[in-house]
């Protein structure tokens, strides 16, 4: 499922303006995504989240990211992420494959 190289291109085009992925990377408009998988929503240390994000209480996984990345504002009403989402399932699969590799050791 998914192509990490294609996912990296999607990340650069649609995500990198607001997010970093490397360990110790700085927060931008959005949080650094290192350690994303297995972490609860709203828990990246040092980032100021909305209550909606903190209170959602789901664990980030391939499944939850598939749903979230399709329509972030529907999945977490009140999130400050202004991204409209990625409608194509194959693009979400590629992006998640890339994130899985890029955000963990």
Curated annotation (Swiss-Prot):
It is found in: Mitochondrion intermembrane space. Heme c binds at residues 15, 18-19, 81. InterPro entries: Cyt_c-like_dom (IPR009056), Cyt_c-like_dom_sf (IPR036909), Cyt_c_1A/1B (IPR002327). Its main location: mitochondrion. GO terms for molecular function: electron transfer activity; heme binding; metal ion binding. SUPFAM superfamilies: Cytochrome c. The modification N-acetylglycine is found at residue 2. Binds 1 heme c group covalently per subunit. Phosphorylation at Tyr-49 and Tyr-98 both reduce by half the turnover in the reaction with cytochrome c oxidase, down-regulating mitochondrial respiration. This is one of two isocytochromes C found in the testis. The other is identical with the form found in other mouse tissues. These cytochromes are assumed to be located in the sperm. GO terms for cellular component: mitochondrial intermembrane space; mitochondrion. GO terms for biological process: apoptotic process; hydrogen peroxide metabolic process; positive regulation of intrinsic apoptotic signaling pathway. Pfam families: Cytochrom_C (PF00034). Keywords: Acetylation, Apoptosis, Electron transport, Heme, Iron, Metal-binding, Mitochondrion, Phosphoprotein, Respiratory chain, Transport. The keyword Mitochondrion applies. It comes from the Eukaryota. Electron carrier protein. The oxidized form of the cytochrome c heme group can accept an electron from the heme group of the cytochrome c1 subunit of cytochrome reductase. Cytochrome c then transfers this electron to the cytochrome oxidase complex, the final protein carrier in the mitochondrial electron-transport chain. Belongs to the cytochrome c family. This is Cytochrome c, testis-specific. The lineage of its organism: Eukaryota, Metazoa, Chordata, Craniata, Vertebrata.
């Amino acid at each position: 499922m998914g192509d990490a190289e294609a996912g990296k291109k999607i990340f650069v085009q649609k995500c990198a303006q607001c997010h970093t992925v490397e360990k110790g990377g700085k927060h931008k408009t959005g949080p650094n995504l290192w350690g994303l998988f297995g972490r609860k929503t709203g828990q990246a240390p040092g980032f100021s989240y909305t209550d909606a994000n903190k209170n959602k209480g789901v664990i980030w996984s391939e499944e939850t990211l598939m749903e979230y990345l399709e329509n972030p504002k529907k999945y977490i009403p009140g999130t400050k992420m202004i991204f409209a989402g990625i409608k194509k399932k194959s693009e979400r699969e590629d992006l998640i494959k890339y994130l899985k590799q890029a955000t963990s050791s």
